[in-house]
Amino acid sequence: MKFPLLFISLALAAFLTRVQDADSSVISKEKSVRDGEEFPCAGTMADCRGLADNSVCCDTGKCIGEVCYY
C-alpha cells in the first residue's frame, strides 16, 4: 500500500511543479505585453503641451491639442 501512495504523491508533485513553471512563464509574457501597452512612450517625448498640432510624439504618434495620439 505504501508504494502506490508514494508514486501518486511524486507524480502529483511533478505535475504541480510543471503547472507552476508554465503559469509563471505565461504571467511574465502577459506582463511584458501589458507594460508595453501601459508605457508605449517610455524614453520618448510624450508631452504635447505647448506644441503645434501634428507634431511628432512617442516616435510614431501625433500631437492634437495637448494629447499624444499614437
UniProtKB/Swiss-Prot annotation:
The keyword Transport does not apply. Disulfide bonds join C41-C58, C48-C63, C57-C68. Expressed by the venom duct. Its main location: secreted. GO terms for molecular function: toxin activity. Residues 22-33 form a propeptide. The keyword ATP-binding does not apply. One of its GO terms (cellular component) is extracellular region. It is found in: Secreted. Keywords: Disulfide bond, Knottin, Neurotoxin, Secreted, Signal, Toxin. Residues 1-21 form the signal peptide. The presence of a 'disulfide through disulfide knot' structurally defines this protein as a knottin. The cysteine framework is VI/VII (C-C-CC-C-C). This is Conotoxin Cl6.13. The lineage of its organism: Eukaryota, Metazoa, Spiralia, Lophotrochozoa, Mollusca.
